[in-house]
């Protein structure tokens, strides 16, 4: 599958404020696209196929988008192995991103290293450690548990923001535990 939306957040640091950016890609193939799934995310097949003016303005070729993403991500001045990817079920995202860079013959400029943090696995570990494994760990479940609002579930932009808030609450929990030691 080709990603249609890629949304990233750069966490705030001493040198830069927090920033989020979302890119829209025209898929390489339209074979496996389900129209019903597009509607959930607010996309239209005719836009993806560039049959509309709006679609031609919004959805760009992966080769163009990758350069924009690389430039935006590397503004932090870090090397790829110093940067980490945080996500919910992050291996899915990391594999899809790496495959996208591979299809564009650009793996050598992939802006992330191997460091990943997964909100789903963090939550599973917390529950497992307390002997209370939940039946599931969907982002929807975690936003509810932590009181996080996801204004438009299943859109990359909103899911990324919600995941970040869940991650910050998980991180705050660990900070409190570690401060007691």
PLM features: residue spans?
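A short alpha->loop->secondary-structure connector
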Residues: 102-113
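Short alpha-helix plus adjacent loop in nuclease-associated cores
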Residues: 116-133
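Short coil/loop linkers at secondary-structure junctions
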Residues: 44, 107-108, 129, 149
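Alpha-helix N-cap/helix-start motif at coil-to-helix transitions, marked by capping-box chemistry
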Residues: 63, 113, 133-137
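Acidic, Mg2+-coordinating catalytic module of metal-dependent nucleases/exonucleases
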Residues: 84-91, 95-96, 100-101, 132-181
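Conserved non-catalytic scaffold segment of RNase H-like nuclease domains
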Residues: 1-90, 98, 144, 154
């Amino acid at each position: 599958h080709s990603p249609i939306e890629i949304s990233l957040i750069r966490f705030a640091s001493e040198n830069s404020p927090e920033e989020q950016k979302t890119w829209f890609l025209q898929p390489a193939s339209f074979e496996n696209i389900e129209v019903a799934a597009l509607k959930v995310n607010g996309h239209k097949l005719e836009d993806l196929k560039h049959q509309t003016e709006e679609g031609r303005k919004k959805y760009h070729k992966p080769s163009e988008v990758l350069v924009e993403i690389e430039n935006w991500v590397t503004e932090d001045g870090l090397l790829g192995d110093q940067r980490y990817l945080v996500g919910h079920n992050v291996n899915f995202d990391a594999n899809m991103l790496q495959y996208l860079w591979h299809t564009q013959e650009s793996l050598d400029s992939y802006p992330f290293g191997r460091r990943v943090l997964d909100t789903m696995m963090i939550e599973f570990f917390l529950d497992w450690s307390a002997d209370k494994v939940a039946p599931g760990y969907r982002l929807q479940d975690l936003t509810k548990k932590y009181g996080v609002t996801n204004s438009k579930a299943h859109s990359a932009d909103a899911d990324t923001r919600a995941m970040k808030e869940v991650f910050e609450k998980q991180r705050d929990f660990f900070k409190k535990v570690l401060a007691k030691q």
